[in-house]
């Protein structure tokens, strides 16, 4: 399950974070570790990685000077976590891309983006979406090759997030294919949720037209 989402500028400025009702002390500890990780980024740090941290995994992607981070339970599918991050990145860039590099941006200035975070998290935590992962995982293995590090090594043993190797062109293409497939699953889920309502509404309008307006 996705537990928390955080968005930072690479210089450490927090731009947005999900408003989590969960007061679990262990989750709060993960958020503290995320802030430390952000301070360790260098120009050579990997653009995508997973950091194992106790019962959680911290997944992140970096793009256009912004770092998108999700804290998920250890058993949550990694491919789904990175697809979630890709959706978050795309919408955040579309909504605020022109404002992110300004020097007068305040901490958590884009907190209103939490509305999108909550809606998207609800979709990605839906068991029906996760159930469709099996077939995708059989065809698309590339995202699983994301670099994995341990939080203790990063914080206390001098390890870094530097790239182990660049993703190959084919791997990047597989990642794009995966995200497109996952987005289709999300769309199909929304259709299944709202199609009955739309059908009932259409029937009601048609009935009114038939009785009074024709």
Curated annotation (Swiss-Prot):
Pfam families: Longin, Synaptobrevin. One of its GO terms (cellular component) is endoplasmic reticulum membrane. InterPro entries: Longin-like_dom_sf, Longin_dom, Sec22, V_SNARE_CC. The keyword Transmembrane helix applies. Keywords: Coiled coil, Endoplasmic reticulum, ER-Golgi transport, Golgi apparatus, Membrane, Protein transport, Transmembrane, Transmembrane helix, Transport. Residues 6-117 form the Longin domain. It comes from the Eukaryota. GO terms for biological process: endoplasmic reticulum to Golgi vesicle-mediated transport; protein transport; retrograde vesicle-mediated transport, Golgi to endoplasmic reticulum. It is found in: Membrane; Endoplasmic reticulum membrane; Golgi apparatus membrane. It is a single-pass type IV membrane protein. One of its GO terms (molecular function) is SNAP receptor activity. Its main location: membrane. The keyword Magnesium does not apply. Residues 1-192 are cytoplasmic. Residues 132-192 form the v-SNARE coiled-coil homology domain. Residues 214 are vesicular. The chain crosses the membrane at residues 193-213. Required for transport from the ER to the Golgi complex. Belongs to the synaptobrevin family. This is Protein transport protein SEC22. It comes from Kluyveromyces lactis (strain ATCC 8585 / CBS 2359 / DSM 70799 / NBRC 1267 / NRRL Y-1140 / WM37) (Yeast). The gene is SEC22.
């Amino acid at each position: 399950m996705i537990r928390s989402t955080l968005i930072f500028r690479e210089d450490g400025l927090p731009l947005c974070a999900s408003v989590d009702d969960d007061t679990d002390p262990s989750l709060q500890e993960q958020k503290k570790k995320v802030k430390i990780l952000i301070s360790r980024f260098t120009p050579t740090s990997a653009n995508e990685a997973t950091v194992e941290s106790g019962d959680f995994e911290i997944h992140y992607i970096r793009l256009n000077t912004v770092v998108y981070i999700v804290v998920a339970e250890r058993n949550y599918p990694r491919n789904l976590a990175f697809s979630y991050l890709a959706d978050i990145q795309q919408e955040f860039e579309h909504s605020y891309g022109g404002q992110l590099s300004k020097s007068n941006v305040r901490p958590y200035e884009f907190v209103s983006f939490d509305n999108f975070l909550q809606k998207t998290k609800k979709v990605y935590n839906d068991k029906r979406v996760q159930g469709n992962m099996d077939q995708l995982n059989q065809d698309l293995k590339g995202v699983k090759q994301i670099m994995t590090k341990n939080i203790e090594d990063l914080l206390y043993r001098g390890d870094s997030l530097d790239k182990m190797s660049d993703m190959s062109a084919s791997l990047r293409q597989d990642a794009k294919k995966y995200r497109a497939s996952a987005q289709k699953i999300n769309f199909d889920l929304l259709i299944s949720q709202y199609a009955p309502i739309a059908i009932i509404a259409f029937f009601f309008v048609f009935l009114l037209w038939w009785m009074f307006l024709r």
